[in-house]
Amino acid sequence: YSAVPIDAWVVIGILVLMMFQTWVVMYRKFRYSGRVEKGNERFRSEFAEVGTDLEQLMDNRQLEDDLRHSSLWQLYRVAVGELRTRRAQGADTNNLSAETLEAIRASMDGVRTQQNRELSSSLGVLSNAIAGGPYIGLLGTVMGIMVVFLGTAMAGDVNINAIAPGMAAALLATAMGLFVAIPALFAYNRLNGRNRDISSDMRVSLDEFVTRLAEIHATSTEPAERPASAARHDHAQTPVT
């Protein structure tokens, strides 16, 4: 290591800091996405059993604590919160208009955006490591080789045995850059795949909840129109005497 020029050591030090930063980010993001996936799986199993009482999960405090990391639970909580807020203000939540359903959907969309932003936070650190790590390492190698050649020229000794150790040591910077970038690349792709799956689950869950809400509580004018239609039909069928 004594053959490594000081310039290369500076670059290697920067790469070591980048490596620790990327590994910390990878650990935190994998841990977070794993908790979200586990919570979402639990929420799906619980929500599948609610039937027509869509609000019953909200009253289970133990379940709320268990699902605090679930992105689907966050969508569910804001939707039920919107319903209960309207009910507390005197609105008839047994008959929801299309506008009310769209307002609830908009609130859930806002939470979904926040969850997606949380999932993608800090991924820029991995992206920077992937794109910048090899180039920073290459910069250290180039600077190290330049120093080796400059020292050789000043000494007047062109013996390959004198040059080779310095060049090999300078290449350590490139190796460090690749060591930073390659794990970050695999982790970035894996985390992106997980985030896409979680985002898809949120979109499906949002649509399912709003659809079931509309099925149970949506305002329908069909029952009011049906008697008039039936009356007209009966009048048409009445024989003239």
Regions found by a protein language model. Name each.
Residues Y1-S45, L191:
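Hydrophobic membrane-targeting segments
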Residues Y1-V4, D66, Q114, V158-A169:
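Membrane-helix interfacial "entry" motifs
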Residues P5, W23, L57-N60, Y76, ...:
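Residue-level signature of catalytic and energy-coupling elements of molecular machines
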Residues V10-V16, F20, S121-G151, I163, ...:
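Bilayer-spanning, highly hydrophobic alpha-helical transmembrane segments
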Residues K38-Y135, V147-N159, F186-T241:
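Predominantly long cytosolic amphipathic alpha-helical stalk/bundle segments
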